[in-house]
C-alpha cells in the first residue's frame, strides 16, 4: 500500500507527514508469541497460522511474510482471493483455503493452494476439474462438523465420502480437521470435550475407511493453551499469535499498535460545541486535538462522546463529540501536545481488549476493522 502524504498546519507551523496514520506491526512481539505457542507443542507438531481477513487486520502480506520467516508450517486464509494475494507477493508456504468456493478451484489449483472440503458436492466439483487437467493426488483438507453446525461433514455423510475418496485418485486427503466453538470458555468445557471426543471418533473412522492416515488438527489458539493433549499432528494458531491469550492473567505481547498524528490543535471558549450534532461541549479553557482517523478507519462511533480515551504522551485523553467518518477529536486540556505529535489508539496503552470491552465485543472485531487504507508498518 502506498503511503499517504498530507500537508497540515497548526500554530506550530506546517508539518508534512508520510503515513500520518499507521498500524505498526511489532516483529519481536510476533516472534515472542510464536515461540510461546511453539513451546506448548511437541516438536513433531506442525503449526498453522491464520492470516485470514487481512491477517486479522494486521496486513495479510506483511504478517504472512513474518510467519514464513518465523518458521510456520502452514498458513490458512478464508477465501481464495486472500491466498492469491499472498502468492503474488512471494509467500510460498502451503496455504489452506478454508472457504474455497467451487468457482475458484481453477485458480486454487494454478497457485497450488489447498482447499478445505466441507461437503461431497464440493469434492465432486474439484475432482472433475482435476480430472480434466490430468492431475492426481491433489491435497485436500476434509472439514468435519463436530458441533459448530456451520460447515463440514457429519457422521451420516462419512460412508459416502469414504467411498468417493477410494475411487478418486485425483485427490488425496492431506488432513482431517474440525473447529472448536467454546475452547476459550471454561464453563463450557464439557461441550468442548464432547467435540474433541467426536472428532477423535469421526476422524479415526474416516482414516480407517480410506486406508491411510492423514494429518489431524482441531485446536485453535485457546485450545492450544487449554487442551494441548489434543494437539494431534497440527494446530491452528489464530488470535493468539496477534497477542490475545485465553488464559486468565497470561499477557502476550500485542503485535499491532494503531497510531496517528495530531492534525490540528484548537483552543475553545466556554459554550463552544464540537463535531456533528454538537455533542461535544467546551468548558472554560478546553483544548482539543483533531486526529486523522474516524469510523471509516475502524474507530467505532460508540467510542465518541468521551466513551474512550486514547494515549497522548502517556496521558489518557477522552474523545469529545461524535466520531466522524475520517476524523475524531480528543479533549487534550492540560496535556502538553502539538500538531504532529503521536497518539496511540490501541497497542500497549490502551490495549485492544479495553476498546473491545467498551464496545461489548471481542478483540478480533476491533483488529479486523482496521481498513487497508491505514498503512501497515513492520517495526523491528
Feature locations, PLM:
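Active-site anion/phosphate-binding pocket segments in diverse small-molecule metabolic enzymes
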Residues: 2-27, 31, 81-82, 101-103, ...
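Active-site-proximal beta-alpha core segment in soluble small-molecule metabolic enzymes
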Residues: 4, 8-9, 16-17, 21-32, ...
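Basic side chains
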Residues: 38, 52, 87, 143, ...
Amino acid at each position: 500500500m502506498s503511503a499517504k502524504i498530507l500537508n497540515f498546519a497548526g500554530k506550530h507551523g506546517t508539518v508534512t507527514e508520510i503515513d500520518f496514520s499507521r498500524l505498526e506491526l511489532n516483529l519481536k512481539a510476533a516472534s515472542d508469541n510464536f515461540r510461546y505457542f511453539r513451546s506448548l507443542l511437541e516438536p513433531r507438531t506442525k503449526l498453522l497460522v491464520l492470516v485470514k481477513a487481512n491477517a486479522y487486520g494486521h496486513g495479510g502480506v506483511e504478517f504472512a511474510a513474518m510467519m514464513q520467516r518465523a518458521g510456520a508450517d502452514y498458513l490458512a486464509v478464508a477465501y481464495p482471493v486472500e491466498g492469491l494475494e499472498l502468492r503474488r507477493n512471494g509467500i510460498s508456504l502451503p496455504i489452506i483455503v478454508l472457504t474455497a468456493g467451487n468457482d475458484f478451484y481453477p485458480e486454487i489449483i494454478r497457485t497450488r493452494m489447498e482447499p478445505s472440503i466441507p461437503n461431497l458436492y464440493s469434492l465432486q466439483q474439484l475432482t472433475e476439474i482435476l480430472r480434466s487437467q490430468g492431475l492426481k493426488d491433489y491435497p485436500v483438507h476434509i472439514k468435519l462438523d463436530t458441533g459448530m453446525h456451520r460447515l463440514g461433514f457429519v457422521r451420516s455423510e462419512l460412508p459416502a465420502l469414504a467411498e468417493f475418496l477410494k475411487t478418486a485418485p485425483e485427490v488425496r486427503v492431506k488432513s482431517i480437521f474440525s473447529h472448536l466453538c467454546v475452547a476459550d470458555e471454561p464453563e463450557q468445557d464439557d461441550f468442548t470435550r464432547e467435540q474433541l471426543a467426536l472428532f477423535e471418533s469421526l476422524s479415526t473412522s474416516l482414516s480407517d475407511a480410506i486406508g491411510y492416515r492423514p494429518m489431524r488438527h482441531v485446536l485453535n489458539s485457546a485450545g492450544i493453551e487449554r487442551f494441548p493433549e489434543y494437539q494431534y499432528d497440527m494446530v491452528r494458531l489464530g488470535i493468539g499469535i496477534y497477542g490475545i491469550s485465553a488464559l486468565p492473567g497470561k499477557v502476550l505481547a500485542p503485535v499491532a499498535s494503531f497510531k496517528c498524528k495530531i492534525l490540528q490543535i484548537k483552543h475553545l471558549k466556554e459554550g463552544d460545541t464540537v463535531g456533528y450534532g454538537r455533542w461535544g461541549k467546551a468548558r472554560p479553557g478546553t483544548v482539543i486535538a483533531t486526529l486523522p482517523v474516524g469510523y471509516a478507519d475502524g474507530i467505532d462511533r460508540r467510542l465518541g462522546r468521551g466513551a474512550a480515551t486514547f494515549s497522548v504522551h502517556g496521558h489518557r485523553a477522552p474523545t469529545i463529540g461524535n466520531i466522524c467518518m475520517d476524523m475524531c477529536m480528543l479533549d487534550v486540556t492540560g496535556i502538553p501536545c502539538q500538531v504532529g505529535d503521536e497518539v496511540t489508539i490501541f497497542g500497549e496503552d490502551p490495549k485492544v481488549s479495553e476498546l473491545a470491552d467498551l464496545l461489548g465485543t471481542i478483540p478480533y472485531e476491533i483488529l479486523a476493522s482496521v481498513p487497508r487504507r491505514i498503512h501497515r508498518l513492520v517495526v523491528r
